[in-house]
Structure formats: structure tokens, C-alpha cells
């Protein structure tokens, strides 16, 4: 009896830790993406579409990101509709859960966007090139850590990551290669939007290139240093050797 109670308490504690790491990861990721936009040097490829739309049409960045994520979820659902039986229903349920995740995540973006000033306009020492590069590096570190934490918990994926995984599975190619393809598509479409509606690129710059090159490295380094300990704390990996 006591053994069963201990097991239940351990499972409950692990579940709470798992959700705690997941939500903390989403917060850190939202902070990283927001800092990325505030540095004014180019944003991450996957959100370049929503950022360009928010600037060109003077819309809320978080709301535009929610629309973008909604499109990503609908694409995943359309692909999963071909699946039959219990597996198909399970995949569609996982897709549907990305909608409430998107609402919460984009509200985080809005809160951080209000609290953090744009460095291009604030007129402080941080608005110089060195200051903006420093904020960009901090943004990429936060983005990598947040993505690593939330993805490692294996709960509801961020719609961007979910789309990459679904497309990789559908076309039978590696996730890394598909991520590069999706990033390239987003960058090209953002450039076209900017040139057509603003007469110049919007949201694409050195920060975009740095995000492509460095965020994956940050994720790998975080997993190497903290991954095993975090997974054990979340109950996803045994502490035994």
C-alpha cells in the first residue's frame, strides 16, 4: 500500500515537473523570439512571415503569429486526415491541442513585446550596433534553450516544429533537412511580401542568418549539458546507469 502511494506521489511529482519545464521552456522561447524582433537585425525564419505582416499592415505581432500558427496547424490536420483509425484520431487530437498552445504562447509574445522597447527607437546605449548584436545573441540563446526545454518534454509541439515533423514524415526526409527547407520557404516568402508591400525587405537580416546557424547549436549544447538531468527530473528517463 505504502509502495503504491509512493509510486503515485513520484508520478504526480514527475508530471508536475514535466509541465513545469514545458511551460518554462515556452516562456523562455517567447522571450527569445521577442528579443529577436527588438534587436532590429532580422528575425528567426519561422516567424519572419508574421513579423513582416505585423510591420507592413501595422498589426499586432502576437496576433499575426497566432494566425500563422493556425495555418501551420491546419496544414498538419489536412495531412493527418488521410490517416485511418485510432492512429489518425490521435494525430488529429494532437494537432487540435496546438490551438490552445498557440493562444497561450502568442499572449506571452504580446506581454513581452509591450514590456521590451525596440532598440532601434529607444535612443539608449543599447541601440547602437554592439548593443543590438548583444541583444541578438541573447535572443538566440533564449530561443535555443526554450525550444530545447519545451521539445524535450514531448507534450504538445510548437506549431512550427509540428509542421516540420509532419512534412519530414510525409516526404520521408530528415527533420533537419526539412527544417532548412521550411526556413528557406519562410525567408523567401517574407522577402516577397516586403518587396511587394513595403518596397524593401522586412524582418530579414543578419539576425535571420545567425538564427539559422546558431539556434540549433544552442539546442544541442543545452541537451549535452542539461538534457539528461532535466529528463530525469521530469520522469522521462531513468536515473539508473
Residue ranges and their predicted role:
Residues 2-241:
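Extended, low-hydrophobicity, polar/charged segments
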Amino acid at each position: 500500500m505504502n509502495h503504491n502511494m509512493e509510486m503515485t506521489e513520484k508520478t504526480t511529482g514527475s508530471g508536475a515537473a514535466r509541465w513545469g519545464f514545458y511551460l518554462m521552456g515556452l516562456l523562455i522561447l517567447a522571450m527569445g523570439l521577442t528579443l529577436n524582433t527588438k534587436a532590429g537585425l532580422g528575425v528567426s525564419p519561422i516567424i519572419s512571415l508574421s513579423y513582416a505582416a505585423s510591420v507592413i499592415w501595422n498589426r499586432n505581432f502576437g496576433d499575426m503569429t497566432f494566425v500563422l500558427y493556425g495555418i501551420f496547424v491546419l496544414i498538419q490536420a489536412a495531412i493527418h486526415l488521410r490517416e485511418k483509425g485510432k492512429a489518425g484520431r490521435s494525430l488529429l487530437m494532437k494537432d487540435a491541442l496546438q490551438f490552445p498552445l498557440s493562444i497561450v504562447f502568442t499572449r506571452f509574445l504580446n506581454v513581452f513585446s509591450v514590456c521590451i522597447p525596440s532598440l532601434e527607437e529607444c535612443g539608449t546605449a543599447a541601440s547602437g550596433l554592439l548593443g543590438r548584436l548583444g541583444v541578438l545573441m541573447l535572443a538566440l540563446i533564449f530561443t535555443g534553450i526554450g525550444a530545447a526545454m519545451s521539445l524535450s518534454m514531448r507534450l504538445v509541439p510548437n506549431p512550427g516544429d509540428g509542421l516540420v515533423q509532419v512534412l519530414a514524415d510525409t516526404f520521408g526526409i530528415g527533420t533537419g533537412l526539412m527544417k532548412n527547407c521550411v526556413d528557406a520557404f519562410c525567408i523567401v516568402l517574407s522577402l516577397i511580401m516586403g518587396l511587394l508591400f513595403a518596397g524593401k525587405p522586412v524582418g530579414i537580416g543578419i539576425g535571420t542568418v545567425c538564427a539559422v546557424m546558431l539556434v540549433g547549436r544552442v539546442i544541442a549544447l543545452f541537451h549535452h549539458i542539461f538534457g539528461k538531468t532535466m529528463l530525469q527530473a521530469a520522469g522521462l528517463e531513468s536515473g539508473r546507469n
